[in-house]
Amino acid sequence: MQNLIAILTLALLATHFTTACQTPTSTSTSRLPSWTLTPTNTTQQFRGLGPVSNDIVWVSGTKGTVLRTNDAGSTWTDVSPHFSLSENASNFEFRDIEAWSANSAVILSIGEGNLSRIYQTRDGGETWKMTFVNQEAAAFYDCMAFEKEIPSHGIARSDPVNGRFRLIETWDSGSHWSILSMNGTLPAALPGEFGFAASGTCIEAAAGRWYIATGGVDPGRIFRSTNPRLGWHLSNSSITGAAAAGVFSVRFRDAKDGIAVGGDFEKPTANKDIASWSCDGGVEWHKAVSFPGGYRSDVAWVPGRKDTAVAVGTSGSDITFDGGRNWTGFGNGTFDAVECINRGVCWASGARGRVAKLVMGDE
Ligand SMILES: *[C@@H]1O[C@H](CO)[C@@H](O)[C@H](O)[C@H]1NC(C)=O
Ligand SMILES: *[C@@H]1O[C@H](CO)[C@@H](O)[C@H](O)[C@H]1NC(C)=O
Ligand SMILES: *[C@@H]1O[C@H](CO)[C@@H](O)[C@H](O)[C@H]1NC(C)=O
Ligand SMILES: *[C@@H]1O[C@H](CO)[C@@H](O)[C@H](O)[C@H]1NC(C)=O
Ligand SMILES: *[C@@H]1O[C@H](CO)[C@@H](O)[C@H](O)[C@H]1NC(C)=O
Ligand SMILES: *[C@@H]1O[C@H](CO)[C@@H](O)[C@H](O)[C@H]1NC(C)=O
Ligand SMILES: *[C@@H]1O[C@H](CO)[C@@H](O)[C@H](O)[C@H]1NC(C)=O
């Protein structure tokens, strides 16, 4: 009887596995999209990208710069925080932004010691309040993520402190943050392992699950958790890691299907083993069949188009129509971050003030 149950269970598991991992049938291999640049009138680099709707988008980046558009990129308004005379805006680089409306957003600045900070606005960027300032010498904050289902719940992620990735958590949309301090349950890092503050997506929240991407070790690794207070599991990503290489971005469209991208930012066109996909919630990661054209710092699923995702990096952009198995290049302009919102609209941002939009035609 027990054997029978075991066999039945195995059969069920096998069926479930096969169903979950069915190869997507790519329907829309046809037209490739193209980016349209918008006039930001600045040369700052924007690694922080926060689209809210088709019209409202925020970007954040170097020299303490934050811009917002309310008209789909036709015009951009400088809504940067004002720094006191003793604090030079040039020292601040906002590598990540999360925005909920034209009024409400939080930004993360990177750096050693107290340069790692989080600011919050409720009035469209007219005023910003510092709601977190790092006091740990070893910490260096890289990225943050908020849940779609519980938008007030977010986690910001730092490089390791005492051998474990440092995480801070907010339950009120970034007004207050506290360190998740249970040593035994935080993700343990290998020597030399860290995260990339390249696009704000080295931590991901999707369908009630959390993911953390790492590099500096080979291969780059991906941690996952259904409850960050209780513990983390980890997997090899199948993406090659090195001093400047590993997993830069991990994104899930639901509880099962995820894509990870990365590579070596010092070798922008090297593309061996720089992208992988998972269909079991990040337990196993499989190498892509054909890779994007080079190092990619960010990837975003396109909502409403089941197996479509867009990846960007300093050497260009790529699209997949089969959930990350095969990638096709479209455009070679430099970008750091990409986000897609409803109705096949994506935004990308990067160096030299580049912020661009693409609208995919009907499927
Ligand atoms: C662009 O920026 C320059 C220098 O900051 C400024 O003088 C000019 O008015 C801006 N142009 C637009 C269209 O915003
Ligand atoms: C701010 O820093 C920049 C770059 O380090 C420097 O060029 C500038 O003079 C500084 N400004 C002030 C007011 O200290
Ligand atoms: C950051 O550190 C500098 C140098 O130690 C100090 O002068 C400044 O007051 C600190 N700022 C904050 C917000 O902690
Ligand atoms: C976590 O570990 C560090 C170093 O091992 C130790 O100093 C610290 O007290 C620990 N914190 C907690 C909350 O256990
Ligand atoms: C992950 O990769 C490391 C380094 O190659 C290897 O030692 C380890 O066994 C791998 N873990 C799994 C679960 O495959
Ligand atoms: C895409 O990847 C699949 C494996 O999932 C492979 O069988 C297929 O031939 C590839 N398609 C193209 C167009 O390269
Ligand atoms: C990028 O694309 C443009 C337009 O297709 C082309 O003229 C240019 O040579 C390309 N640059 C590189 C570095 O491939």
Regions found by a protein language model. Name each.
Residues 21-363:
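Residue-level hotspots at or immediately adjacent to binding/recognition sites across diverse folds
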Residues 3-18:
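Cleavable N-terminal signal peptides of Sec/SRP-targeted secreted and luminal proteins
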